[in-house]
């Protein structure tokens, strides 16, 4: 068995355990597990680099992403078009280093392992999708018009 096949089998096992543990808890606990605040925005797109900002609950995270791999637009496109029961991984590159992502959707919930949360977290998919779209639109508006958007962080 080749290395890629083994990695996929391990990922499938891991996600099976994660989704089973989510399914096994009571509805109240599921609501608690998906109750996070989340935001995303593009801070800048420069020559060869994209700068993005994430907030999960009270933790803020900034990334500089190289154009040598998938970028912010790929994250937005993939995040907002994830089908039910679909899982995907991708990597953002920095020099040096990389940021690995895992997105797994089941029905109306998404499980995310991000560079800032290796243990993963759950969100209601529509909430996540709306925050990603909003961050993309505000970021583009800010960069190309220099307009301050109401409610935007300083």
Where are these regions (language model features)?
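Long protein-protein interaction modules used by eukaryotic assembly/scaffold proteins
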Residues: 2-3, 14, 30-47, 53-56, ...
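Short Lys/Arg-rich cationic patches that frequently serve as NLS/NoLS or arginine-rich RNA/DNA-binding motifs
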Residues: 1-22, 26
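Compact, well-ordered interaction domains used in eukaryotic information-processing assemblies
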Residues: 67-110
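N-terminal low-complexity, intrinsically disordered segments
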Residues: 19-77, 86
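Alpha-helical interaction segments
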Residues: 8-12, 65, 91, 126
């Amino acid at each position: 068995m080749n290395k890629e096949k083994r990695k996929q089998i391990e990922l499938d096992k891991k996600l099976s355990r994660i989704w089973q543990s989510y399914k096994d808890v009571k509805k109240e606990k599921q609501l608690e597990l998906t109750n996070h605040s989340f935001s995303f925005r593009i801070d800048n797109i420069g020559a060869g680099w994209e700068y993005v900002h994430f907030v999960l609950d009270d933790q803020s995270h900034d990334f500089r992403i190289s154009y040598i791999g998938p970028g912010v637009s790929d994250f937005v496109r993939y995040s907002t078009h994830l089908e039910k029961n679909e899982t995907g991984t991708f990597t953002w590159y920095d020099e040096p280093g990389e940021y690995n992502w895992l997105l797994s959707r089941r029905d109306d919930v998404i499980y995310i392992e991000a560079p800032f949360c290796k243990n993963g977290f759950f969100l209601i998919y529509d909430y996540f999708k709306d925050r990603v779209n909003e961050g993309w639109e505000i970021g583009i508006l800010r960069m190309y018009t220099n307009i301050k958007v109401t409610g935007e962080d300083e």
